[in-house]
């Protein structure tokens, strides 16, 4: 714990740098915009979802309540005719960017604290190990930020091209 307190400034600066760079990537350079698509009949899709009174949450098409139903003939037909999809519905109203950005910064801070903790446990605060500690912090951070979407590509059909961005 003392090592983390000694590293408070690098931890905070690292979280701020990641936050600022990620904000630039998403809001200024719009790196991921090409990954999102709209429906040609968006108004009809929105009306259908509203008609179902769906609460905020995650939904899957086609839906089955268990593996037995998923393996049934009716479900096989639904899969064959499509569409197959995963939908996340948020609460109605404008997006609260302040809250989202605040939570994103807290996540950046959390990743940095975990990486610093691991490095301090392995190498202490000895300046002779700074290069090795930096490599470890970089690897842990890369895994935390970069590998989280692999499961989405495997299970939810997100394009694998997202993994390289």
Each predicted region: which residue ranges?
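Juxtamembrane/disordered regions of integral membrane proteins
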Residues: 1-165
């Amino acid at each position: 714990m003392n090592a983390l307190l000694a590293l408070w400034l690098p931890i905070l600066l690292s979280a701020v740098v990641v936050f600022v760079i990620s904000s630039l990537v998403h809001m200024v350079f719009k790196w991921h915009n090409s990954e999102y698509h709209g429906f040609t009949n968006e108004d009809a899709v929105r009306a259908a979802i509203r008609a179902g009174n769906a609460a905020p949450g995650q939904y899957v098409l086609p839906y089955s309540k268990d593996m037995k139903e998923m393996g049934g003939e009716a479900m096989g037909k639904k899969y064959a005719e499509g569409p197959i999809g995963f939908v996340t519905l948020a609460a109605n109203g404008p997006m609260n960017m302040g809250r989202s950005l605040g939570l994103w910064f807290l996540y950046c801070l959390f990743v940095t604290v975990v990486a610093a903790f691991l490095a301090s446990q392995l190498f202490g605060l000895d300046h002779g190990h700074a290069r090795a500690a930096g490599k470890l912090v970089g690897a842990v951070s890369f895994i935390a930020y970069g590998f989280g979407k692999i499961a989405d590509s495997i299970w939810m059909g997100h394009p694998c091209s997202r993994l390289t961005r």
